[in-house]
Amino acid sequence: MLSQVYRCGFQPFNQHLLPWVKCTTVFRSHCIQPSVIRHVRSWSNIPFITVPLSRTHGKSFAHRSELKHAKRIVVKLGSAVVTRGDECGLALGRLASIVEQVSVLQNQGREMMLVTSGAVAFGKQRLRHEILLSQSVRQALHSGQNQLKEMAIPVLEARACAAAGQSGLMALYEAMFTQYSICAAQILVTNLDFHDEQKRRNLNGTLHELLRMNIVPIVNTNDAVVPPAEPNSDLQGVNVISVKDNDSLAARLAVEMKTDLLIVLSDVEGLFDSPPGSDDAKLIDIFYPGDQQSVTFGTKSRVGMGGMEAKVKAALWALQGGTSVVIANGTHPKVSGHVITDIVEGKKVGTFFSEVKPAGPTVEQQGEMARSGGRMLATLEPEQRAEIIHHLADLLTDQRDEILLANKKDLEEAEGRLAAPLLKRLSLSTSKLNSLAIGLRQIAASSQDSVGRVLRRTRIAKNLELEQVTVPIGVLLVIFESRPDCLPQVAALAIASGNGLLLKGGKEAAHSNRILHLLTQEALSIHGVKEAVQLVNTREEVEDLCRLDKMIDLIIPRGSSQLVRDIQKAAKGIPVMGHSEGICHMYVDSEASVDKVTRLVRDSKCEYPAACNALETLLIHRDLLRTPLFDQIIDMLRVEQVKIHAGPKFASYLTFSPSEVKSLRTEYGDLELCIEVVDNVQDAIDHIHKYGSSHTDVIVTEDENTAEFFLQHVDSACVFWNASTRFSDGYRFGLGAEVGISTSRIHARGPVGLEGLLTTKWLLRGKDHVVSDFSEHGSLKYLHENLPIPQRNTN
């Protein structure tokens, strides 16, 4: 065996350190079926990420974001993770995924250790096979599968199963790790090995030597000879956890080896405040030891020695010893493929045990507060909601100096880290704050007839009337980048529409967002609804927020097209309002006015090229090529220092063309523009439908018939005639402000203001009406009469 280790490229080590060790290498994988090898090779979608690893041990990590610095990691695989649902045999797919993730982390320079169950299940499968082989032909023919199970299970003693399964389990791990050029070593321990000082030193030395040589130790209790569990005791004045199961073994091993992180995988999502499956059970994101009294434990899992209570006790003991702990689900098919690497990357998976008490409410608690506050907000009178918004507008001007001081801190910290356009978005000024205040007062004025407005009234039958009324959507999550002025705008729209609101701003605007949120809550407090608008801590990952489908009803991203695409991809069961791209077109018709074209092109492209409603593709009618109008357009673009990209057709007309466009479906967001030639208005429409993003498209022409044809046939959220693309904006549309621009085809489209944040519900008022009254022989008949809609007093 030592020679095999040497042939793997490692130096041999002292033999006296090997009382429990069985090294496994590439030379002993002949007993594994080729199908298993192929299955392992199919798992290859985890990226290799290089991170600085400065930790060896010390205090446990305070936050999830610090877990990426963990160097030494123990992964404990529970019986429910390793075994199949029938508890006989191993779950090969899950094991293949786990081995791949462990290998990826090992190859990043981390020191990985596995504590695994599964020997009993593997041995049970093998012994059942032996029982079947030992039967006579007559017994085999007359014994059904269920009869075999009933006969076999009582006679299979767990220790015998463990003895029969250890070698096969290790051979399986060996074959899997071999695919990633990693060696593994098996170590079997009992509780006595931790209580005997000499054995503890030998075990510690063996593990350190294996880690030094880049070998993954695979540790398990020696279930073939394990004695009954002993009570927890003191070891030289230190509280010591007894090795009663693999949970306590993993905790004991993690502390003995001064491990940075212990990952405990089981068949539940993590630690709940009450038994999973109960109506009010909620997953605990961060567990602080002082909160133990708030947790109620249920029964243990379907297999294994311990339940969640045993896991928590082991986790708290490890945490006390300086090891961070995460308990997570290793069986869920949607997350198990990356659960280990996701935990190490700091993603919100399972329950993170921390000795640092969370400074504020969790995002789940914030979601509940926003829900409750939003419902209270919706019950206020329209005048009260308008009063809150007016008060917020006053605070923006009254507290101007404090706001600008906070914004100055953000700008100073961002200097040299952000590009000039982003710094411009980040910057606040007196004029910006004054414009914000004006916009908020417009929202307040338009909010008088929003929530509770009757859209339809129908008399179903005598004394049975139906109404359709507007109501808030619920809880909105608005994610925005670099623009702190977005916060009061969106907050005012949420207040006017009676929605609860979660705000997630970029860390580059942390100081500005903090003071603007405080002012928003101050305005809300005048009517006792302070909690309706919540600012999410910057530590929360956007991807984690997008998974809160039970907390959030609508996500509205405000930022780059890449941000929108990422959120649309990450959102799990939550609708996203927005547009991933703003590829806006302008078609210059053969009947276009010379004076209008250059003004419209300049304003659409050069006024604010980073905006989502800026012009990106200019379509020119072919009859305009080599005309004074075309020359004026090109000269103006050169003066404005706009880089031109030639489309394929346009390039064919030129002897010396600008750089040919790489893609006709490009949002430049800068002083760059694609020019392409089209044959007629229909050709322009076809081009827009093929390469556009359904955002904003314009025709420039003096021919009214051509213009109307374009307006009616272009399928975009905004279609203009002789107007700049930059008019595609909520403020310019008279909406007061907008939460974003939507290119979706349901609910809201184009600039989305107050109306886009409302939905409807039906109110039916009757007097002891039942459906059977309207049957063929019933006493009532359907009337379905449209009734007049009462006008609300908005003064």
Curated annotation (Swiss-Prot):
Changing K76A: No effect on punctate pattern in the mitochondria. Can form homodimers/multimers. InterPro entries: AceGlu_kinase-like_sf, Ald_DH/histidinol_DH, Ald_DH_C, Ald_DH_N, Aldehyde_DH_dom, Asp/Glu/Uridylate_kinase, G-glutamylP_reductase_CS, G5K_ProBA. This is Delta-1-pyrroline-5-carboxylate synthase. It is linked to Cutis laxa, autosomal recessive, 3A: A syndrome characterized by facial dysmorphism with a progeroid appearance, large and late-closing fontanel, cutis laxa, joint hyperlaxity, athetoid movements and hyperreflexia, pre- and postnatal growth retardation, intellectual deficit, developmental delay, and ophthalmologic abnormalities. The keyword Iron-sulfur does not apply. Residues 1-361 are annotated as: Glutamate 5-kinase. Transmembrane segments: none annotated. GO terms for biological process: citrulline biosynthetic process; glutamate metabolic process; L-proline biosynthetic process; ornithine biosynthetic process; proline biosynthetic process; response to temperature stimulus. Isoform Short: Inhibited by L-ornithine with a Ki of approximately 0.25 mm. Isoform Long: Insensitive to ornithine inhibition. This is due to the two amino acid insert which abolishes feedback inhibition of P5CS activity by L-ornithine. Keywords: Amino-acid biosynthesis, ATP-binding, Disease variant, Hereditary spastic paraplegia, Intellectual disability, Kinase, Mitochondrion, Multifunctional enzyme, NADP, Neurodegeneration, Nucleotide-binding, Oxidoreductase, Proline biosynthesis, Transferase. It comes from Homo sapiens. Substrate binds at S117, D223, N246. In the N-terminal section; belongs to the glutamate 5-kinase family. In the C-terminal section; belongs to the gamma-glutamyl phosphate reductase family. Its EC number is 2.7.2.11, 1.2.1.41. Changing T299I: In ARCL3A; benign. Changing R138Q: In ADCL3; loss of punctate pattern in mitochondria when overexpressed; no effect on interaction with wild-type protein. One of its GO terms (cellular component) is mitochondrial inner membrane. It is found in: Mitochondrion; Mitochondrion matrix. Residues 362-795 are annotated as: Gamma-glutamyl phosphate reductase. Bifunctional enzyme that converts glutamate to glutamate 5-semialdehyde, an intermediate in the biosynthesis of proline, ornithine and arginine. It holds the Pfam family AA_kinase. The modification N6-succinyllysine is found at K311, K347, K550. It catalyses: L-glutamate + ATP = L-glutamyl 5-phosphate + ADP; L-glutamate 5-semialdehyde + phosphate + NADP(+) = L-glutamyl 5-phosphate + NADPH + H(+). Its main location: mitochondrion. CDD domains: AAK_P5CS_ProBA, ALDH_F18-19_ProA-GPR.
